[in-house]
């Protein structure tokens, strides 16, 4: 049976365009002009995923999102204008349970949606596979050991040929909150970190700024030539590849170029460059996400002597990228998200 998608948008043009795009991909599509109509339709037939606008009459999308997550959680993809203040709203939606974001321009919407059909279908299909209970488990703190219990030993890692120099992280669907959990746990003197998160280009700068406010380390959108330093995390700009080179230290390279593994930025591009440049001094981490971007790169990192970690199935919103890496033998460790940060700290000691 085809996955059932509910498109909630007050624009008839958007509803029609998304219905055609998703319908051609074999998805069953229902539409609603606003959240109140959507709630009535959801009482009759529960969708597998919702595509949601934010600015609508009678009830805004964020209020509707909160109600959905509180009453009967359904994977939600936000499809809204993200430029300027909209990017902050989109971040808020992700924090409140949305699994991904699709950019929607203010003008030329129909043509833009048609041009972005492949990404839209990919994101919505991934949402139908999202497991919201896994997101709850990922964000839940680890239970405290009972009084008198022996402390859990630190992970025993293989001897490292070089010093702990660089952490590289890749993520996609569900990754924005996973990255927040990971980076918030980093101390101010954490090793240099480079991140690729699949997201629209107008979104990454605001995402990095939000993380910077929450974390003890500095977090910024990467610019070409930025130094990768202890206590700093660089986030790949949307629609640009991020790699690393050595020039009196580790330096970020931000570049154009064709998509790799169907993505720009590509996790594989970052991981392959880290394997060449930093090798055994690298820790590679592959978090939740759809598809297989990063799986080959994580395997190359492991072959170069790096320590490698994949997020486990129980805490992955979409167990795609980590699953592929595990299947290829790329992961030295498979860990629930709350234990990934402790693995970083154990490796860096």
UniProtKB/Swiss-Prot annotation:
Notes concerning its domains: Contains a C-terminal catalytic domain, and an N-terminal region which modulates catalytic activity.
NCBIfam families registered for this protein in UniProt: PRK00742.1, PRK12555.1
Protein name per UniProt: Protein-glutamate methylesterase/protein-glutamine glutaminase 1
Domain CheB-type methylesterase, chain residue ranges per copy: 159-349
Modified how: Phosphorylated by CheA. Phosphorylation of the N-terminal regulatory domain activates the methylesterase activity.
Gene that this polypeptide is encoded by: cheB1
Family annotation (Pfam families): CheB_methylest (PF01339), Response_reg (PF00072)
EC id: 3.1.1.61, 3.5.1.44
Role noted for this protein: Involved in chemotaxis. Part of a chemotaxis signal transduction system that modulates chemotaxis in response to various stimuli. Catalyzes the demethylation of specific methylglutamate residues introduced into the chemoreceptors (methyl-accepting chemotaxis proteins or MCP) by CheR. Also mediates the irreversible deamidation of specific glutamine residues to glutamic acid.
Molecular function per GO: phosphorelay response regulator activity; protein-glutamate methylesterase activity; protein-glutamine glutaminase activity
Active-site annotation: 172, 198, 293
Coiled-coil ranges (or none): none
Chief location of this protein within or outside the cell: cytoplasm
């Amino acid at each position: 049976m085809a996955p059932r998608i509910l498109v909630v948008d007050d624009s008839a043009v958007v509803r029609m365009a998304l219905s055609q795009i998703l319908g051609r991909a074999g998805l069953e599509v229902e539409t609603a002009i606003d959240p109140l109509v959507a709630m009535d339709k959801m009482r009759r037939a529960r969708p597998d995923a919702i595509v949601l606008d934010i600015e609508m009459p009678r009830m805004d999308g964020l209020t509707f999102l909160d109600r959905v997550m509180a009453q009967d959680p359904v994977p939600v993809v936000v499809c809204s204008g993200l430029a300027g203040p909209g990017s902050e709203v989109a971040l808020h939606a992700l924090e409140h349970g949305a699994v991904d974001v699709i950019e929607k321009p203010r003008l030329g919407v129909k043509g833009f949606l048609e041009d972005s059909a492949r990404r839209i279908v990919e994101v919505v299909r991934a949402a139908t596979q999202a497991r919201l209970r896994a997101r709850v488990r990922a964000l839940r703190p680890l239970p405290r050991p009972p009084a008198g219990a022996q402390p859990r030993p630190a992970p025993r890692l293989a001897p490292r040929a070089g010093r702990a120099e660089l952490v590289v992280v890749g993520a996609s669907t569900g990754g924005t909150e996973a990255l927040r959990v990971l980076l918030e746990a980093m101390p101010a003197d954490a090793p240099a970190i480079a991140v690729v998160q699949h997201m629209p280009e107008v979104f990454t700068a605001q995402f990095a700024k939000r993380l910077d406010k929450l974390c003890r380390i500095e977090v910024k959108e990467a610019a070409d030539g930025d130094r990768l330093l202890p206590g700093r995390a660089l986030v790949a700009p949307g629609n640009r590849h991020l790699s690393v080179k050595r020039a009196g230290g580790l330096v970020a390279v931000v570049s154009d170029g064709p998509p790799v593994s169907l993505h720009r930025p590509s996790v594989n591009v970052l991981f392959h460059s880290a394997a060449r440049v930093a090798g055994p001094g690298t820790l590679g981490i592959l978090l939740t996400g759809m598809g297989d971007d990063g799986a080959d790169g994580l395997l190359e990192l492991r072959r170069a002597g790096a320590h490698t970690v994949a997020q486990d199935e129980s805490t992955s919103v979409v167990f795609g990228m980590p699953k592929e890496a595990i299947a290829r033998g790329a992961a030295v460790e498979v860990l629930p998200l709350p234990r990934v940060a402790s693995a970083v700290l154990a490796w860096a000691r």
